[in-house]
Regions:
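Beta-lactamase-like hydrolase cores
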Residues: 23-73
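Active-site-adjacent helix/loop patches that line small-molecule binding or acyl-intermediate pockets
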Residues: 23-34, 102-213
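Short glycine-rich loop/turn motifs
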Residues: 51-56, 172, 200, 292-295
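A short glycine/serine-rich beta->alpha loop
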Residues: 69-77, 109-113, 157-165, 217-224, ...
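Active-site SXXK
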Residues: 78-95
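Bacterial peptidoglycan biogenesis and beta-lactam-recognition machinery
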Residues: 92-99, 131-135, 181-187, 193-200, ...
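Structured C-terminal helix/loop/strand segments within mature extracytoplasmic catalytic/sensor domains
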Residues: 240-369
Length: 369
């Protein structure tokens, strides 16, 4: 619960009052600790068994909070939802263009992938263009996500390394920028490294906050990660969805947003929620999940985004809450609702495959605040 604490915000977030970087300084205020609300309920025998608490913030490209559940200003670590914003310096600096990174490679910069062959090959390609190989990556190594996702042991004799890490695309991008800028590579994950200082400064601008107001922690891949109000995270993605029309990061946002929706298989992988949502979104939705119950979904046609935090990090509850928000906002048609129905996780099955309970969203979005 430590991450869900007070934070300084710019703007009060009320509908029509922007949270953006142009908000006057006198509107800075402190937000009280987050108020969580029940988002998803599990029932058994018709009786409530579990409640998953959390919060939702729906924000437009100007930073106005359009709708919410719980406290939209509650602070959460962003985890892998931050990757698209962490990739901005690579584009803003011209490094991506100088190295000739393809659209597919830009998509992998934003990925939490499965370590499938296409992911590994694309990470290798980014590194090769920077004149490096996987041995410089500082993300560490884990069993490829495809196997953990399916709850299966990897084949005997399978060799995996840093390229298979779900964050290898982000780290390959970090290395590429270091090479282009002439920065040292061996300590690129350190918070004081010029790369990470550039990332922090750019992320702060993208979400309309001051650097000193953004708490920092170290992510599972050893890179710095940042905590912020859900409304700020959603604001950054609403700007990403705005693309070329964004006045500060337009060209970079356009390239990243187009890459993510054109290559959702590279952003995630077989069987993953982000892949399912972006395919169902038909090029309009940008979706990114982060560890421990965080997700952001943005709509290009609306220049809006919503961020969700499930406080206990439960993934099935997160999926159910996301589908509910899509429905309540009217973003889905009947075909899309049918395509994503399995992600509601409505029936809870026992070891014999018999339905013994149900999981369902139990919240209604309220107006902006």
């Amino acid at each position: 619960m430590a991450a869900w604490g007070p934070v300084m915000l710019v703007g009060n977030g009320a509908k029509g009052v922007p949270l953006g970087p142009d908000c006057p300084v006198e509107m800075v205020r402190a937000v009280s600790p987050v108020e969580l609300t029940p988002l998803v309920e599990l029932t058994r025998g018709g009786h409530s068994e579990c409640l998953h608490f959390g919060a939702v913030a729906v924000v437009d490209r100007h930073g106005s909070v359009l709708a919410h559940a719980g406290n939209p200003h509650g602070v959460s670590f962003t985890r892998s939802t931050l990757k698209a914003l962490q990739a901005l310096p690579l584009l803003q600096s011209g490094a991506a263009m100088d190295l000739g990174l393809s659209q597919a490679e830009l998509a992998l910069l934003c990925a939490s992938h499965n370590g499938e062959p296409l992911h590994v090959q694309t990470a290798e390609s980014i590194l090769a263009k920077a004149g490096q190989d996987y041995r410089v990556l500082r993300c560490g190594c884990h069993v490829p996500g495809l196997f953990t996702l399916l709850d299966k042991a990897p084949p005997e004799g399978l060799v995996y390394d840093e390229r298979h890490h779900n964050c290898s695309g982000k780290h390959a991008g970090f290395v590429a920028m270091c090479v282009q800028q002439g920065w040292p590579i061996e300590d690129y994950t350190e918070p004081a490294h010029p790369l990470q200082r550039a990332v922090r400064a750019t992320v702060a601008r993208a979400v309309g906050m001051r650097e000193e107001d953004i708490p920092m922690g170290i992510d599972g891949c050893s890179a710095p990660n940042y905590a912020m109000p859900l409304a700020r995270l959603a604001y950054g993605y609403a700007r990403l969805a705005t693309g070329a029309a964004d006045t500060e990061f337009g060209d970079s946002f356009a390239l990243l947003g187009e890459a993510m929706t054109a290559h959702p298989d590279l952003v995630s992988g077989t069987g993953r929620n982000d892949l399912a949502l972006m395919r169902a979104g038909r090029g309009d939705w940008i979706s990114k999940i982060g560890a421990d119950g965080v997700q952001v979904v943005a709509s290009k046609s609306r220049s809006e985004a919503f961020a969700i935090k499930i406080s206990d990090g439960n993934k099935p509850a997160l999926y159910a809450a996301t589908i509910s928000v899509l429905e309540q906002l009217g973003w889905m048609d009947e075909v899309q609702a049918a395509e994503l129905d399995a992600w509601r996780g409505a029936d809870i099955l026992n070891a014999r495959g018999l339905p013994v309970g149900a999981r369902s969203a139990c919240f209604a979005l309220k107006g902006g605040t």
